[in-house]
Amino acid sequence: MAPPNDPVHSTFNVSKTHKKDNLFELSDGKLFVKNIPLLFDVPSNVSFSTFSSICQTSRAPLPLFHCAHSTSFKGGFLGFSKEEPSHHLMNSLGKFTGRDFLSIFRFKTWWSTQWVGHSGSDLQMETQWVLLDVPEIKSYVIIIPIIEGKFRSALHPGTDGHVLVCAESGSSQVKASSFRAIVYVHVSDNPYSLMKEAYTALRVYLNTFKLLEEKSVPSFVDKFGWCTWDAFYLTVEPAGVWQGVKEFAQGGVSPRFLIIDDGWQSINFDDQDPHEDAKNLVLGGTQMTARLHRLDEGEKFRKYKAGSLLGPHPPLFEPKKPKMLISKAIEIEHAEKARDKANQSGVTDLSQFDIQIEKLKKELNEMFGGDQQNSPQPMCKNGEELQFNSQGCESGSCNSEDTGMKVFTRDLRTHFKGLDDIYVWHALCGAWGGVRPGTTHLNTKIIPCKLSQGLDGTMDDLAVIKIAEGGIGLVHPDQADDFYDSMHSYLSEVGITGVKVDVIHTLEYVGEEYGGRVELAKKYYNGLSKSLAKNFNGTGLISSMQQCNDFLLLGTKQISMGRVGDDFWFQDPNGDPNGVYWLQGVHMIHCAYNSMWMGQIIQPDWDMFQSDHVCAKFHAASRAVCGGPVYVSDSLDGHDFDLLRKLVFPDGTIPKCQYFALPTRDCIFKNPLFDGKTTLKIWNLNKYGGVIGAFNCQGAGWDPKRKRIRGYSNCYKPMTGSVHVNDIEWDQLKEASEMGKAEEYAVYLNQAEKLFLTKPTTDKIPIPIAKFAPIGLTNMFNSGGAIQGLQYEEATGEGANCASAKVEVKGGGKFLAYTSVLPSKCYLNGAEVEFEWTSQDGKLILNLPWIEETSGISSLTFIF
């Protein structure tokens, strides 16, 4: 029996204390907020209910329950009713025009991004929320479509400024005609507090997800890592992974976590031998109709022999081989596209195209080693063939401890001592095409895909086309627990500490027979959460291709980290040569604006990048201040270690910010992608300071007519802008709130290497005569992130006339501080040291060593 106040099992009720009048009112066809009309021409079938009237009880923790109800007068729910029940209902919520808004919408099934406009008709399909500027009352209002019963909702554009809500179940067998709380609205005078308050209210009301503050995050959140994807694509193999980790170690930037991306699994196609892996797969896209035929590692990793890469003369791996394979596969892809284009244009004789394609495929096969790829199962020393069952476990009399993923991960950790975490990739349904029926112990059925009407307005996507072409081998939802536990328990046993779960939103395609998208998702997410808690310490999961309200509101009770951007693209897959530049700004916009809502629920992950990319410095600067992990997808022999050393300490940790990066207020309702005038600014907080990143992202964005993201060449130009200490929202983190009250700030411009003082427009507070402010390590992008401790002391008592500043710094390199007066002495780890100081600008500089014994921590004391 649970204790009376157990937060997990207790149900709390609203107290009968006096409640403030709600700030929203629906009357005379208008939705008012603080007596200001927000939505006009609201249909008579739309209802408004206060938060307190709908959310009378909750099983949320008591502090959150109280928090939600303390601001309940700021929010409420919209509902609507129809005469006829349906599985897909559309209704206007009213209209607005001439009012600035920021929104997040799905431009692909799995990815979302920002969009701004001035009327309800400017919204895009599948809008996940819209934030309205209400300057008449110096406030902001958010409208969030949510989940009610077995239905989820999204906002769509209507005519003449109307905002439409679309409620759908995802199954023609699941119908409804009315909703009381299908949309949530909330008002606040602070846009960042607004997001916190709104999602806290929804967490308490729905109780289907947890806030980030309630959960632990993966252990690598403050570390550096490497992901294999862009280095190998599907050709990933043990020797290549080993070579990659070795290159980083030799370069002095050792990864603390490794993600073995797509390509390691046991997959094949429906027309192939059900017990053999598909061969010679290279590019993403070629595997999207393939399915898992067993739940352990593929043959490439099963064949690995213990110690084979540990000896003094390990087998040589040609670093150029992956790029050669990828290059040849791209040739094949281009040839196939040329054939398809010719076919669509009416060409009847395609034989020359087919001959060319077959020639290229033969060349690719020879590059793989020809028939050598069709090798038998790995053999034991006694010649007996190893056998694996469908659950990923070995059987037979052979000693399986000598081969496979288990010994590979063991060898990696033996040789690379700092490698804490090894993750592997898998799709939510197993592989892109799910699990192949009849090949495992699971009850699996190929389900045809049916896309919702809302996705008609999204971008063409090869992944969607391929998945719809082959359907999904769906494990019955009643076996979701068994499915994930079978896979994850095996992975945990062989040294894998977590998983990157991709292709999450395919579930919405296949809900017809399983109670709809909400009910199907609940069973899968519940099974995934249980397995995560059991097998990966409750935290070892990165969610990806998940940027939709179904997942955020249903799948995050346990999951605490997720991608906030589309994939890093090093070039435009559609052939625009300028895409190598403008795609990087698009990626940054995705991450910054998605963090506004996702950051309330999961730790934002800004994805990997390549350190030798032409825009690597652009990416590196954003990762330095993003507040999440830093990892790259460098190809073999493709590293910029000088750049990486500005991001990563020698021990593989990073100077991580204390919060997650968000757009500054003056960017919220602007278009930093193609308005030709706005510079993206993002802010974050360090332990003893704040940081602002300013980026020129102009040159690309969403095209509503073409339904795709494209380049806007008229915006390829230099930008100017300004930053201010007030751009930092100090009050969003309790520990930083006092810093927002300072009269004066020392500001360091990282790229210009300039240091100066500035004053905000705040009430004056007493300050000491000697002004001192540590900046941090200037050789790091996030200089202030190196400051781990700060303490000011003033001598007291008769005759006392000195003061001191004690600073703890992690890392080695050039330490910079501002001081208005010359310190009389400086001590480094207890020993007096010399330093440089210039009176003109107050710069104090000294070089710090990296001290391995203290994990890089140095103690500085300045005496004044």
Residue ranges and their predicted role:
Residues A2-R203:
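N-terminal accessory beta-strand-rich subdomains and adjacent acidic, glycine-rich linkers
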Residues S219-V518:
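Aromatic-lined carbohydrate-binding/catalytic grooves of carbohydrate-active enzymes
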Residues F232-V236, Q265-F269, C429-V435, T506-V510, ...:
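Flexible loop/turn segments at secondary-structure boundaries
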Residues Q387, S395, N399, G404, ...:
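Beta-rich interaction modules in large eukaryotic scaffold/regulatory proteins
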Residues P437-S489, E493, N526-L643, C657-T679, ...:
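Glycan-recognition surfaces
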Residues D502, A742-I765, Y827-N847:
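Solvent-exposed beta-strand/loop surfaces of large extracellular or lumenal domains
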Residues R623-C626, Y631, I668-E738, P766, ...:
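Carbohydrate-binding surface patches
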Residues K759-G789, F815, T838-F864:
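C-terminal beta-strand-rich structural cap/linker in extracellular carbohydrate-active enzymes
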